[in-house]
C-alpha cells in the first residue's frame, strides 16, 4: 500500500496462496431432514390438568368459580397472581368498574 488512503487496487486477496486447501462446499450434502411425524414424536407432551378455581369477587366478595386446564407452572403462576395483583369480578360488579384500567 502506497499513500495515506487505501484503494481497492492496493487490496488483493489471493486465497489460493494463503490456503491452497480451501475448496468450495457443496450445499446439497447428504444430510436428511426429519419428517413431520418424527418431529412430533420427539416433542414432549405438555401435561395439563383441569382445575376448579374459587376466588372472591374483587368488589362484593361473592365466591366466583372458574374452570381451567393448565400446566403445573401455569396454575402456580395464576395462584400467585390471584394472591398479589389480580382480582376477578362477578357479572354484577363488572359494570361498576371501568374497563381497561381507565
Swiss-Prot record:
SUPFAM superfamilies linked to this entry: E7 C-terminal domain-like
Keywords: Activator, DNA-binding, Early protein, G1/S host cell cycle checkpoint dysregulation by virus, Host cytoplasm, Host nucleus, Host-virus interaction, Inhibition of host innate immune response by virus, Inhibition of host interferon signaling pathway by virus, Interferon antiviral system evasion, Metal-binding, Modulation of host cell cycle by virus, Oncogene, Transcription, Transcription regulation, Viral immunoevasion, Zinc, Zinc-finger
Domain of life: Viruses
Motif stretch (Nuclear export signal): 75-83
Pfam families: E7
Gene Ontology terms for molecular function: DNA binding; DNA-binding transcription factor activity; protein domain specific binding; zinc ion binding
Zinc finger (unnamed) residue numbers: 57-93
InterPro entries in alphabetical order: Papilloma_E7 (IPR000148)
Organism: Human papillomavirus 20
Gene Ontology annotations of biological process type: DNA-templated transcription; symbiont-mediated perturbation of host cell cycle G1/S transition checkpoint; symbiont-mediated suppression of host innate immune response; symbiont-mediated suppression of host type I interferon-mediated signaling pathway
Gene behind the chain: E7
Residue spans crossing the bilayer: none
Role according to the record: Plays a role in viral genome replication by driving entry of quiescent cells into the cell cycle. Stimulation of progression from G1 to S phase allows the virus to efficiently use the cellular DNA replicating machinery to achieve viral genome replication. E7 protein has both transforming and trans-activating activities. Induces the disassembly of the E2F1 transcription factor from RB1, with subsequent transcriptional activation of E2F1-regulated S-phase genes. Interferes with host histone deacetylation mediated by HDAC1 and HDAC2, leading to transcription activation.
Compartment(s) where it occurs, according to its Swiss-Prot or TrEMBL record: Host cytoplasm; Host nucleus
Record-annotated disulphide pairs: none
Keyword match Zinc-finger: yes
Protein name: Protein E7
Motif (LXCXE motif): 27-31
PTM: Highly phosphorylated.
Domain notes: The E7 terminal domain is an intrinsically disordered domain, whose flexibility and conformational transitions confer target adaptability to the oncoprotein. It allows adaptation to a variety of protein targets and exposes the PEST degradation sequence that regulates its turnover in the cell.
Region listing for E7 terminal domain, in residue ranges: 1-43
Gene3D superfamilies per the UniProt record, alphabetical: 3.30.160.330
Subunit structure: Homodimer. Homooligomer. Interacts with host RB1; this interaction induces dissociation of RB1-E2F1 complex thereby disrupting RB1 activity. Interacts with host EP300; this interaction represses EP300 transcriptional activity. Interacts with protein E2; this interaction inhibits E7 oncogenic activity. Interacts with host TMEM173/STING; this interaction impairs the ability of TMEM173/STING to sense cytosolic DNA and promote the production of type I interferon (IFN-alpha and IFN-beta).
